Amino acid sequence: MVYSYTEKKRIRKDFGKRPQVLDVPYLLSIQLDSFQKFIEQDPDGQNGLEAAFRSVFPIQSYSGNAELQYVSYRLGEPVFDVKECQIRGVTYSAPLRVKLRLVIYEREAPEGTVKDIKEQEVYMGEIPLMTDNGTFVINGTERVIVSQLHRSPGVFFDSDKGKTHSSGKVLYNARIIPYRGSWLDFEFDPKDNLFVRIDRRRKLPATIILRAMNYSTEDILNLFFEKTTFEISNNKLMMTLVPERLRGETASFDIEANGKVYVEKGRRITARHIRQLEKEQIERIEVPVEYIAGKVVARDYIDEATGELICAANMEISLDVLARLSQAGHKTIETLFTNDLDHGAYISETIRVDPTNDRLSALVEIYRMMRPGEPPTREAAENLFENLFFSEDRYDLSAVGRMKFNRSLGREEVEGSGILSQEDIIEVMKKLIDIRNGKGEVDDIDHLGNRRIRSVGEMAENQFRVGLVRVERAVKERLSLGDLDALMPQDMINAKPISAAVKEFFGSSQLSQFMDQNNPLSEITHKRRISALGPGGLTRERAGFEVRDVHPTHYGRVCPIETPEGPNIGLINSLSVYAQTNEYGFLETPYRVVENNAVTDEIHYLSAIEEGNFIIAQANSVLDDDGHFVEELVTCRHKGESSLFSRDQVQYMDVSTQQVVSVGASLIPFLEHDDANRALMGANMQRQAVPTLRGDKPLVGTGMERAVAVDSGVTAVAKRGGTVQYVDASRIVIKVNEDETYAGEAGIDIYSLTKYTRSNQNTCINQTPCVSLGEPVERGDVLADGPSTDLGELALGQNMRVAFMPWNGYNYEDSILVSERVVQEDRFTTIHIQELACVSRDTKLGPEEITADIPNVGEAALSKLDESGIVYIGAEVKGGDILVGKVTPKGETQLTPEEKLLRAIFGEKASDVKDSSLRVPNGVSGTVIDVQVFTRDGVEKDKRALEIEESQLREVKKDLTEELRIFEAGLFARIRGVLIAGGIEADKLDKLPRERWLELGLADEEKQNQLEQLAEQYDELKAEFAKKLEAKRRKITQGDDLAPGVLKIVKVYLAVKRQIQPGDKMAGRHGNKGVISKINPIEDMPYDENGNPVDLVLNPLGVPSRMNIGQILETHLGMAAKGIGDKINAMLKQQQEVAKLREFIQKAYDLGMAPRQKVDLDTFSDEEVLRLAENLKKGMPTATPVFDGAEEMEIKEMLKLADLPTSGQITLFDGRTGEQFERPVTVGYMYMLKLNHLVDDKMHARSTGSYSLVTQQPLGGKAQFGGQRFGEMEVWALEAYGAAYTLQEMLTVKSDDVNGRTKMYKNIVDGNHQMEPGMPESFNVLLKEIRSLGINIELEDE
């Protein structure tokens, strides 16, 4: 296996046995690809902006003498880059410019004669852009648009499973769901009549819709029924016989022909009888006249002579009708063939309940149902019906919908019109009737073939189209308003509705969410999340059990483990590792093709529908070296069921053992040994881990760590290979390899690192270089670690030495006992950065002012502010300290203009102002690490703002100069090369200043050309530098675009260092969570024979009942990994020769049962081996992939290699007494996370504070600095105890007795601890409520 440069530094021992056929795909592609489709120019106009424009344009005026046509669009460059947008609090977006053509036709001339054409580029608002990491910056905060799983458009056949009607009868229904437009439902009622609903309104008989499409009763019966023909001859009634139709009936007369009786009266007709009748080709039999009575006529029968209607279609024949028909000379009579078994008379029955009888009455009925209360006219009724399903503006099935529709009806072609045709509606009705007749199955709504993914691009396109449609109406009116000659396209289009629609979607849609940025994993998971909620989706309350449940089709598409606990369980899912969406938006997953018993490396992506037809072997099936199945019978999946199949039947095989789970779950080692509920908690809690000060790679991982860290975008990754030319804390410079540069560039890549920035969750984002000067790097190598990464691997927590044993009740109820060493070594110390903002507004009494001159505030309080009234950087502040001094004018009187003028001239400033400074919230303390001042254009900047500006300019200048210096050095090196090749001596050159080199002439013409080219580049470089500097300077010095009425915003960033303490929540990766109960001195912790104390003591009772045994296996393997590291460390300390080291490390990598990983240390140089050993001495990291991990034997071998007991248990001694514990204890290394539920954020206690306005009771909650509620049950408790005085003070002075509490406070201050309870305010509220009901209550004074 080839390792990149960073990977060579620390290779993870892999226990996986199955070869990796397919690399893990780029994990954010679902977001990036979808948005790319939205903004890229699509020549076919199938998706994205192009499709939206083409669907709305051209817009014609009502008169038809002008139209506005769409030509093309382009996206401009964003004004600010991503970082600037985040700092300034603006949206990262690009202007959309659309080229439109206004065509004006001659009014009098023949049609289509063009009078004038005007083309113009029109601005149509801003389109938010996606950053490289799949997020959007909206108003300065990073947001993610979550993909939605919704019901695919198409037609669905379903039943109520007997739940609607009390009899338990199963009622079937069909629903046509378009992408946009009205829903059309057909449903049976308990009497077996077929009804139709439009948009879930009241139901109408289904035949109304057929009549509205101009079908007569006769046409309808022809469509839905087979006929039976009777002939009247010689006073006998003959019936045309189709033997198959008699199956299962009882003969009501002798069936005879040619004098032979085939079935006697009263006998049941069996298959044998039918075969006999078919064999002898009996086509007509005589039936008794009574047999026809009750049959239904298939068409109208008219008396030719008189023109009167004897019998209308769909009427029952009685014997006298038969006589009249015979008299009128009708010799053949067609009746409908129905039976109770498989040819129900549903449509015939429905026609009887249908009140309409022609097209107009049907249209009127539909109109009345859709628009009750409006008088129907013929035109309005016709328009309404046409627009419902047959108009492309109002109805669209979409390509997906048409494909699903045609598949559902068993048609061959996949493409077709986006609107419904009459045949479509009739075929749906026919299929529904077939299902009611027992032919065909209903659909499974939760099958992933019936649910599709709607990603960012598609939702943004829909929103954009909504905006365009709003504009369309306005344009139509403008086009009709006369003077077109003076108008340009620009005057027609108002960009406001478009940008409003887009802004609303990105800013406040339910699926546009504030990005979860706790750590890299939470970012990635959030972007791969799939929600069934949101507009056009389900609601939490309505979603039943079935929708939330795991479905067989989730396999390899949606993770069965990772979903939130609580009301959203099963509605919010995570995409599986290898899943992707196909062109229609259905999820598909990769499989290896199996041909002639051999598994090939060819890979097919199958959607849920396609997968149902194949037999698919599992990823852990045993194969021989040629890829043939070893066992005769293989465990396979077919049609959602798992069972054994012979190896010849297998058609596909899973790609990887990880393909079932999501990224979050694939990071849990030994997942296969954990109970599902705990695995769910484990996957969810990894997302809440706070990045620690120094990341520590997990000793026991799964091999997915690198993919997650790199794909998440928190690390700096080399775009091109080269050598490290310069590195410091904030930038890395790479001299690019010659073969990767393109002609005429300096070949330098500069990576600026993010330093101590605030994330959405107030955690700290900081990048640190992990390469050193002169190191070679390749494309894709990790150059710098971000938060929670270690050498380019995800590192959410720390490897802790744990012991499973009780310890004096301190691990009761999952509590955790922690050693003081953990605090001393800062293992779980985290940095949290808070942003506090102070806004100075223009009030109607005058502007608020930011100043250090605050009334009634002492010197001490102002000691940390500079002269502008803003806190210094580096100041340590605590709750209540002033960060930004601000005063607000409080005027009783509004000033007259004269007074304002006098004030302005004489500057009487000290008039009424009140202190409204920004203070540090209660319970927060920290260090000020950054201050930013934003000033409105035209407002004078204060001293501090100018200082900040200057320092920013200095930084930028320094950066750009450094960049220029590096580029220059690169260029001059090439110039020197050309000059020396041209025959100039090196030492002469070096005596000349570099600028003079360019003036030298060379004899060789080709070399001279090269030199001139390089000189040109040098000039370009300098010009570019000047341009860049000027642009940056302009950006920094220009005023900021602030909200209306805001003059200044000052943002202060506080960094808080949080050490671990009792009350913090910690967890492992297996759902084993707990709260720290005590931090114990090192000397009191249990220790082993060598005197090494453990770091954490966990409760062994937390394991058996929860069935997450993965944590125990992880502990054992962690112990072995650490033991091997210790041995390597000892060898390094003894300075043994490299050969021995190489041999030992090689032995460790080769250990285990046929691992897929082949590490060949012979290809490593001694230097590389030493560096590897240096990185392994703290423990050899291992990978046990999900469902393909280390086995018990392998863990034992590892323990043996590390010279540790294979039981994984060791003897411990009590740190307090030095006595040995009575039995060996499981000790090992477990990866523990500190979760973002810190006691500092939760703990609070109220002394005095704010009160509710009406009831005058204290508020509740930490944010309001509220008290603890003493509710009615608590009152009962005090009553039960008879604690009268306690109860009295709870209900009065401690709550809402306003006078009593003020007096009480005074008394306590005076040292007098007495209370005089008065009237609680809530009693007055009660009185007022009773009086408002018109009952007067008066309180009598005693």
UniProtKB/Swiss-Prot annotation:
One of its GO terms (cellular component) is DNA-directed RNA polymerase complex. It holds the Pfam family RNA_pol_Rpb2_2. It catalyses: RNA(n) + a ribonucleoside 5'-triphosphate = RNA(n+1) + diphosphate. DNA-dependent RNA polymerase catalyzes the transcription of DNA into RNA using the four ribonucleoside triphosphates as substrates. The RNAP catalytic core consists of 2 alpha, 1 beta, 1 beta' and 1 omega subunit. When a sigma factor is associated with the core the holoenzyme is formed, which can initiate transcription. GO terms for biological process: DNA-templated transcription. InterPro entries: DNA-dir_RNA_pol_bsu_ext_1_sf, DNA-dir_RNA_pol_bsu_external_1, DNA-dir_RNA_pol_su2, DNA-dir_RNAP_su2_dom, DNA-dir_RNAP_su2_hyb_sf, RNA_pol_bsu_bac, RNA_pol_bsu_CS, RNA_pol_bsu_protrusion. This is DNA-directed RNA polymerase subunit beta. GO terms for molecular function: DNA binding; DNA-directed RNA polymerase activity; ribonucleoside binding. Belongs to the RNA polymerase beta chain family. The lineage of its organism: Bacteria, Pseudomonadati, Pseudomonadota, Gammaproteobacteria, Enterobacterales.
